[in-house]
Curated annotation (Swiss-Prot):
A divalent metal cation binds at residues 279-280, 303. The record marks 303 as: Important for activity. Residues 1-21 are annotated as: Disordered. The active site is at residues 136, 207. Its cofactor is Mg(2+); Mn(2+). It is found in: Cytoplasm. It comes from Arabidopsis thaliana (Mouse-ear cress). The keyword NADP applies. The gene is NADP-ME2. The modification N-acetylglycine is found at residue 2. This is NADP-dependent malic enzyme 2. Divalent metal cations. Prefers magnesium or manganese. Keywords: Acetylation, Cytoplasm, Metal-binding, NADP, Oxidoreductase. It is an enzyme of class 1 (oxidoreductase).
Length: 588
């Protein structure tokens, strides 16, 4: 039986029943209800006073002016001092720098995001190089591993197998309606850390905070989602703090039907133009989902396509340093999963467009090594379908050093997810075969990188052109300072997403990824080359994203896949004007 007030709201009602916590003004019965009675939760609808201060979208903390405090019933609820947003930013950065443990910084930033959204994004935009490793790789990996223990407040939408048949209803529970970007994971392959199940939510949350900070997409237009189909991680299944379903992963038809219901519900609820980014799915599901929905939805896989685009940009930029065209290189990959095959395919496509050779021929410039050795034609029948295009004629080679010595690559790319696999012997062999070996150790987080920047420069006697997935500090070798490049997907996906949104794209095509790569490479200056960089610094990432967005949008219009008409005359200015600003608004 529900607890229904017998007097009119607003009147003082005394309830002197013993054993319950009622009292004066308990008109809705929340305090006087016993455990077996139902209570209706309610909130005020006007954002003022205490409610306004607790709403992260509108809260300004001590930046509320005297006029705003009077108008919105805040007087007395805040100390009398008024601080500008810039002063607040300096204060938060000062406090963050007191933490010596990166996870503590991560937790403090997530707390700020839940408390004061605009201050969080201003902080991230103005201090991107310092804070990017905190809100994303490598710290987000540790955060996901410990997500159950540090969990304070839900972020994003959780859709579990329990909701099968009613996913559309669950989507409608999300309070924002104008969603433009969804980042979704099932938690099976989080970075290089494996199956973290429901605790993978840290990845969509982190990715979307970067869509806003780096690409200027409104926070209210972003939706992080975790699909919980169980986990095969025994440690999590036995962890009392684990926040997900404690059951083995659904697979096969059950999994496919659940994901199909999700994709249909997304399109029904948010329309044709919502961008769905698949994030950290296991290889077999990642390729299948991208293939299945690329012709019916606006979908993008950052692990396959985003990584490919940013790596290709680095290779295009490196042409000036190496004096070689892409077609003149021989590429060797360690790792033949989502990232490795995705990068390889985009490189082959770029060479094909430059030379006019069919892609079946340009693929022969690219070799892949997996856990069983070099991928060659004699293994083709036993290979997964996404590896088969890379099975070339060659005698079997069992390990990486054997492949380096046999193939003699000019470019070595690591996407294995296994740290320290570019051994001294491997790197020295690259240096023996090349005057300036190009070495990209792309696996995340830092602990899983195939080699460190210091190792690459030391073992090649300072001759390597090095890039990594996670950040490394500058390296001093033989009296010279080397600045490692970071082949970070953050260069690509924010600008790509903005370009798709501002053009009203209805599908993603490889030509758009090529456009993003070329736009990024074009922003590497002679000064950057002089410092050994093949990527521009992150300090002007919003300018980079605007240029990428403009090129992606232009390609979308050229392909006839844009729905926002007419086309803006100056797409760069349009991109810049479309970006979310975290500066505080003035309230009436």
């Amino acid at each position: 039986m529900g607890s229904t007030p017998t007097d009119l709201p607003g009147e003082d009602v005394a309830d002197n029943r013993s054993g319950v916590g009622g009292g004066i003004s308990d008109v809705y019965g929340e305090d006087s209800a016993t455990l077996d009675q139902l209570v209706t939760p309610w909130v005020t609808s006007v954002a003022s006073g205490y409610t306004l201060m607790r709403d992260p979208r509108y809260n300004k903390g001590l930046a509320f002016t005297d006029k705003e405090r009077d108008a919105h019933y805040l007087t007395g609820l805040l100390p009398p001092v008024i601080l500008s947003q810039d002063v607040q930013e300096r204060k938060v950065m000062h406090n963050l720098r007191q933490y010596t443990v990166p996870l503590q910084r991560y937790m403090a930033l997530m707390d700020l995001q839940e408390r004061n959204e605009r201050l969080f994004y201003k902080l991230l935009i103005d201090n991107v190089e310092e804070l990017l490793p905190v809100v994303y790789t490598p710290t987000v990996g540790e955060a996901c591993q410990k997500y159950g223990s540090i969990f304070r407040k839900p972020q994003g939408l959780y859709i579990s197998l329990n909701e099968k048949g009613k996913i559309l209803e669950v989507l409608k529970n999300w309070p924002q309606r104008g969603i433009q970007v969804i980042v979704v994971t099932d938690g099976e392959r989080i970075l290089g850390l494996g199956d973290l199940g429901c605790q993978g939510m840290g990845i969509p949350v982190g990715k979307l905070s970067l869509y806003t900070a780096l690409g200027g997409i409104r926070p209210s237009a972003c939706l992080p989602i975790t699909i919980d189909v169980g986990t095969n991680n025994e440690k999590l299944l036995n962890d009392e703090f684990y926040i997900g379903l404690k059951q083995r992963r659904a697979t096969g038809q059950e999994y496919a039907e659940f994901l199909h219901e999700f994709m249909c519900a997304v399109k029904q609820n948010y329309g044709e133009k919502v961008l769905v980014q698949f994030e950290d799915f296991a290889n077999h599901n990642a390729f299948d989902l991208l293939s299945k929905y690329s012709d019916s939805h606006l979908v993008f896989n950052d692990d396959i396509q985003g990584t490919a685009s940013v790596v290709l940009a680095g290779l295009i930029a490196a042409q000036k340093v190496l004096g070689k065209k892409l077609a003149d290189h021989t590429f060797l990959f360690l790792g033949a999963g989502e990232a490795g095959t995705g990068i390889a395919e985009l490189i082959a496509l770029k060479i094909s467009k430059e030379t006019g050779a069919p892609i079946t021929e340009t693929r022969k410039k690219i070799w892949l090594v997996d856990s069983k050795g070099l991928i060659v034609s004699s293994r083709k029948e036993s290979l997964q379908h996404f590896k088969q295009p890379w099975a070339h004629e060659h005698k079997p080679v069992k390990d990486l050093i054997g492949a380096v010595n046999a193939i003699k690559p000019t470019v070595l790319i690591g996407t294995s997810g296994v740290g320290q696999t570019f051994t001294k012997e491997v790197v020295e062999a690259m240096a023996t075969n090349n005057e300036k070996p190009l070495i990209l150790a792309l696996s995340n987080p830092t602990s899983q990188a195939e080699c460190t920047a210091e190792q690459a420069y030391t073992w090649t006697k300072g001759r390597a052109i090095f890039g990594s997935g996670s950040p490394f500090d500058p390296v001093v070798y033989d009296g010279k300072t080397y600045l490692p490049g970071q082949a970070n997907n953050c260069y690509i996906f924010p600008g790509l997403g903005l370009g798709l949104i501002m053009s009203g794209a209805i599908r993603v095509r490889d030509d758009m990824l090529l456009a993003a790569s070329e736009a990024l490479a074009a922003q590497v200056t002679e000064e950057h080359y002089a410092n050994g960089l093949i990527y521009p610094p992150f300090s002007n990432i919003r300018e980079i994203s605007a240029n990428i967005a403009a090129c992606v949008a232009a390609k979308t219009y050229d392909l006839g896949l844009a729905s926002n008409l007419p086309r803006a005359k100056d797409l760069v200015k349009f991109a810049e004007s479309s970006m979310y600003s975290p500066v505080y608004r003035n309230y009436r």
